[in-house]
């Protein structure tokens, strides 16, 4: 039986620890340069269709579907190498590894992310994030629907969830209530999206960047005053 922890930290990957918007920009630029704008736009349309269908962006799946449309295009094979060999470690947000180290000093720390079964694990491994949390990694299709499994694997009296998506933070808060402290790093596409911010409950803690969490001690993070509350409210207006 797994022992109950006092506190467990659950940390998202894309646009929380890793600048996924930058990665997407690099993929788009590579496609345009190597295969042309039409290829880039068609690939991205397939990628977005898969996002709607699956709930996460399946980069390799989109490439395979594009290949079905262009079965004679052998040049596409180089795109898979670009994706698999991408230097993810270069896209870590400043201080992200230090934040994970700080969390690990306080309690078990787990990467909690969504994604496919090939590209997402590769991203987590090559970025150095898996090593930073001693391979404590959970990759789901919809993590907000897998909370029972998370609790079985990492039972705790209290959880801290760090995620750039207000929707995820709100869903987990609704499920776990006061047993979870939700932390919103204002990074990525949702950072200043007034419509999204207005649609979901305010997180317990809001910071401008993941590295700002180094300024917190455990008591302040979990039970102390919530900074940036006024700024979050202003974004919602």
Predicted feature residues:
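Conserved Rossmann-like nucleotide-cofactor binding loop
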Residues: 16, 23, 117-118, 167, ...
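A metal-dependent, Asp-based hydrolase signature
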Residues: 23, 34-38, 47-84, 102
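Asp-based, Mg2+/Mn2+-dependent phosphohydrolase catalytic module
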Residues: 1-5, 125-161, 165-237
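Active-site neighborhood of HAD-like aspartate-dependent phosphohydrolases
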Residues: 2-45, 68-69
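Short, acidic loop-to-helix structural element flanking the phosphoryl-transfer center
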Residues: 60-61, 81-111, 144, 148-149
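Generic enzyme active-site microenvironment
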Residues: 10-12, 112, 161-162, 207
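Conserved SAM-binding loop
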Residues: 17, 109, 161
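Substrate-recognition/cap helix-loop segment adjacent to the acidic, metal-dependent catalytic center
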Residues: 97-110, 114-138
């Amino acid at each position: 039986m797994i022992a109950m922890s006092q506190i467990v930290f659950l940390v998202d990957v894309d646009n929380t620890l890793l600048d996924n918007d930058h990665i997407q920009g690099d993929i788009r630029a590579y496609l345009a340069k190597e295969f042309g704008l039409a290829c880039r736009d068609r690939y991205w349309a397939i990628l977005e269709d898969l996002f709607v269908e699956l709930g996460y962006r399946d980069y390799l799946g989109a490439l395979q579907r594009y290949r079905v449309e262009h079965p004679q295009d052998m040049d596409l094979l180089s795109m898979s190498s670009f994706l698999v060999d991408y230097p993810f470690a270069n896209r870590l947000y400043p201080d992200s590894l230090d934040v994970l180290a700080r969390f690990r000093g306080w309690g078990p720390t787990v990467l909690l992310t969504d994604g496919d079964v090939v590209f997402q694990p590769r991203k987590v491994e090559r970025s150095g994030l898996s090593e930073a949390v001693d391979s404590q990694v959970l990759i789901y299709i919809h993590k907000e629907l897998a909370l029972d499994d998370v609790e079985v694997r990492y039972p705790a009296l209290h959880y801290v969830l760090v995620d750039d998506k207000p929707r995820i933070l709100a869903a987990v808060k609704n499920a776990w209530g006061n047993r979870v402290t939700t932390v919103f790093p204002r990074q990525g596409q949702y950072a200043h999206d007034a419509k999204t911010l207005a649609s979901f409950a305010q997180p317990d803690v809001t910071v401008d960047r993941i590295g700002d969490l180094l300024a917190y001690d455990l008591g302040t993070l979990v039970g102390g005053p919530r900074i940036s509350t006024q700024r979050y409210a202003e974004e919602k207006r």
